[in-house]
Amino acid sequence: MERRRLGFLLLWCFMCMTCQAQKNGDMPFSVVIRDGSTGEVVWYVNALLLDADSAVVDTLKCDRVLRKSSMEYEYSGILPKSGKYILKCTFDRLFTPLFFPFEVELRKSQRMVRLPDLFMKRKDEPQAQMLQEVEVVATKLKFYFDKDTVVYNADAFKTVAGSVLEDLLKKMPDIQLKGNTILYKGNPVRNLLLNGKDFFNRDRHTILKHIPPYMVKEVRVFDKKEDSNSLIKREREMRGLTMDVRLKKEYSTFFLGDATAGLGTDQRYMGQIFGLAFSSRMRLSGLASLNNVNKIPVMSYEESYQNWGGFGDCARDNIQLRYNLDEPLGLYSLMGDVELEYKDDLVTRRTSEIKFYQTGDVFGRSAFNGRTRSFDFSTNHSFNFLGNTIWDFTLQPSFRYSHVKNRDSSLGATFEKDVFSHLGKGWLDSLSLPVLTEPLRSDAINRRTVEEMEDGHSLDASLRLDKDLTWKQAGQNLQFSLIANYKENKHRTYYHGNVDYYENPSLSSDRRNNYNLTKYNKRGIEGAISYKRKLGERNDVSFIYRSSHSSNEDNRALYLLHLLDGWEDSASHPLGELPSTSELFSTLDGANSHDYQKLQNDNSLNLNYRYSYKENRQEKYGVSINIPLKLYHEKLHYSNQLIDTTASRTNVITRVDASFSHSTLGEKPIKLWFSYNFSQSSPSMLQLLNIRDNSDPLVITEGNPHLKNAASHYFGLYLSKRIPYGDISFEANHQFVDNQIATSRVYNRLSGVTRYRPQNIDGNNTTRASVRWNGRFKRKGKIHISNFSNQWSVHLNKNVDLSTTEENTDFTQSVVRNRYLTNMTGIGISLYGILLVTNAEVEFRHSTGNSPRFQDINAWKVQIGNTIKYEYKSWRASSEIKYERYWGYNHSPMNKGLLLCNMELVRKFSKCDLKLEVYDLFNQYKGVDMYVNGQGKIETITNILRRYLMFQLTYKFNNKK
């Protein structure tokens, strides 16, 4: 009893001491003092804290601390109580004395008071006044600090005629551009503003490539906090590292644009017209383009070109429109885009395939030629109304329509042996003969020729309503959303096919003329409510509840036109021709046609907890746990000639996401991150039905009512450390899946028919690990290393599939283990104004399998790429040289070395640009790919854009100049 009383007494004394200490104050505070001319931090100033009567309260100490990922000097002291104070800073030899009065009210919830950065004014220097030759214009200050904002003076950076904003930013200290990603001191810029407006943050390419430097007054970089004074809701919620490009007064409103035309060899062409109008309230930009060089014109975050490594030969016509409109009082804020595109794509593909079976592998070759023409229209909008009131809400309508026409032909055959190894390039001619000759005929299983035509459209429309309520003082946020959507697909497919059987003479050739009509539509509505609350400075919790209802309808009608007299011959009835309605209905394949309707109700609850411990605004420890729970009920009615059934199920899907992070502070920080993910997936209702589809003469698909849910486990680890010459990091992850839903395969060696059925399989897993060094070097002199990186990575994959042949009764697990060892090295060197970037990749692949006839794969891939850029006044030259070499492919044309070269030469003028572009100078590029799993190996070569040379002329216009 006495011990308990003594304990209570000590606790009471401790609480009294704590309360008295809080009452008396003793609150630490800090401040950074800078040179007002250079913005550099100074550590040699005498700093005193004075009270309102100028009596000395404390002498400030200067220490090195971590601020915004770098070490800086910071002055610190103690505030004894709430009240008025004066901060006195002196250094007589260099600065005039600085007196900074301030008032502070101490609160119990505070840990520290941070004063704004102070800037000391330098004393006048007589020597500088005597130098008459030095003019202010010639020595413009390139940048200075305005409190926590760094301000770059645009006129202090010289650019040549025809330059654009990205050229100006590249000349500014501490700013780097990687594509359209902007970095300031290595940290990505989250918000890009133009005159304080974020109209172009989602399509930075628009202003980086088109705003000329002469329009820019200054560039401001700062860490934006939540702004409660803005009348526009979007701007109030903006936060993070921000770059604001401020225009000169005469360019606060403008209209500019450019037009480009290009003609090249091999009938290549491109044309483009761009326009941009801007004011403090609105932005309107448009782009119209056409080309047949596989280029994708975009006004988006990253410009994308498909012709360096892309497949196919594509002509594209495109029109894009983007707009922003902000009402000055914040009553409404509108933004959106509209895009129309027409594509004409030609694809040629050659495939070599090996299928693994215990009774012997099966070899195949095929050729595909296709043409796809498509028209797409899409539009997306976001309308915020009453954004300056508590009644604000946001509407987001979207719509997309696509119409596609395909015409393709294919030829393929399967064999008992690899009979193509000695045929070389003549294999396709031998396969195309009306009658197969020896040695192909004796080892052939079947040969198939197909002509197919498709015509269809798809439609996707949705409308979203969002509303949120925020209580900042309580740290609470409540959001509501309601989404309605509609999807529709309708496709007509015409098929002429012929299959010849060689292994089994009793099977006659299969000739088909089919017409397939499919219709699909889906209607759905979803409501969601989310709540987030902060529990002190370090903890926050949130939950999201979603409820949705959807209905699907799918109809397929397959007509066997070859059953009609005279319709078996494709010559008399070409592809796309249909008989009369009565004759058409008489050929309906009821066993392979179907109608089904599905109703689904989903309810999910997502629980999230996050802990974050920070020191000096940097997170030192972080824990995140996310647990989504999903309960859904499905009801499916499926009917055709053979089955009419209704099925339903109720299922619960769980998931767990957990992560832990730790960071140390200092000059050589260490970052550690670990994550675990558990997720479940369930088979579709159609997979669970006992149905059979044999509409394809060589493929039969079946359902499996005994499928189980699959479960995936993922472990991730990341570790990085700052070293004297850069950063070194280690990353590893491992994933394995229980009851993975795969497709089993039963093969008939006499006909070549394969029967597929979904099955649960265990044993699939993937492991990856990599070590990377990113070098950091000081850029000094005319010769220096701008960047260096080296990465070693290992990828281990175990793929398990089920396959057998009809003469066997049991399935056999086919296991293939793929092992990859990769090294990637990159280095950038600046040599007297010439930038040389070299990237090298070496990959070794070793694959083994448990099949008795599986031949181990030892394949090498070597890629060495060099980019050379040089600028001299208004001339710019660049070249991309890439060498690729492959070994270990069965298909001999793939085992070749390729030397690839792209070149550009640009001459810039104030009003126009001239450009010479050379693509694939040596005409050697190929689209090569290889895929291996437990069921087989596939090697493909796909056509790509061929060599061309193009001249381009760009004319620029601006209403202010």
Residue ranges, per PLM feature:
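Structural motif
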Residues: 32-43, 140
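Short, acidic, small-residue-rich periplasmic hinge/interaction motif at the N-terminus
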Residues: 48, 90-92, 112-155, 177-179, ...
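A short, solvent-exposed loop/turn motif at the edges and junctions
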Residues: 55, 78-80, 84-105
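Short Pro-Gly-centered beta-turn/loop motif in secreted/extracellular proteins
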Residues: 68-86, 160
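Short, polar/charged loop or turn motifs at beta-strand boundaries
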Residues: 149-172, 194-199, 261-265
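Periplasmic plug
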Residues: 181-226, 242-249, 282
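Primarily recognizes Gram-negative and organellar outer-membrane beta-barrels
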Residues: 202-205, 225-267, 281-723, 727-961
